[in-house]
Amino acid sequence: MSVSLSRLERQLGYTFKDQELMVLALTHRSFAGRNNERLEFLGDAILNFVAGEALFERFPQAREGQLSRLRARLVKGETLALLARGFDLGEYLRLGSGELKSGGFRRESILADALEALIGAIYLDAGMEAARERVLAWLTTEFDSLTLVDTNKDPKTRLQEFLQSRACELPRYEVVDIHGEPHCRTFFVECEINLLNEKSRGQGVSRRIAEQVAAAAALIALGVENGHE
């Protein structure tokens, strides 16, 4: 094992028994051979479970939608990339020449994906308890800063954070119709996101309100919120 990977293990707070798992977790798809996408898939599932379980225990009075929004804040790409930068993870990534030249080692999505892959690798290396312990340790500051007040955000913000947590494209809003006189208009808006086959719709006395209604409809269609909160 190289000195550099030993340093990364110290930063992560975990020593791998199988060093090949660690190397694979750091290997981007642009690099020749096997890559970290399968480990990322596994790590994403573990991260969401561990975060959800911890939130369930920490906020016993929270409703389902509130827990979902808190979890989205914890596992979003921005949060994971920030953690990854704290570990200097970009220095250890195995990237293809094109990604290296374009600065892929600094890219938020690549850093977040690699951290999820490391979670998956730790799980395969030592089991669920080891993975849970590391996730909770890494997210201690984020967990301690959460309150239920954080769930009192408007639907557009909640939808954006949910999509960002899954590395999805942001929603696209379009005014498709306007009814009424200038002093008493009704705006009709459609919200399009890649995760849904159909556009979500909203209407209101202003474009802003119509967009919020459309975003709320999208959250319900995604199953993030049930519409009864």
From Swiss-Prot:
It is an enzyme of class 3 (hydrolase). Its cofactor is Mg(2+). It is found in: Cytoplasm. The active site is at D44, E116. It comes from the Bacteria. Its EC number is 3.1.26.3. GO terms for cellular component: cytoplasm. The keyword Cell membrane does not apply. GO terms for molecular function: double-stranded RNA binding; metal ion binding; ribonuclease III activity; rRNA binding. Keywords: Cytoplasm, Endonuclease, Hydrolase, Magnesium, Metal-binding, mRNA processing, Nuclease, RNA-binding, rRNA processing, rRNA-binding, tRNA processing. NCBIfam families: RNaseIII. Belongs to the ribonuclease III family. This is Ribonuclease 3. It comes from Pseudomonas savastanoi pv. phaseolicola (strain 1448A / Race 6). The gene is rnc.
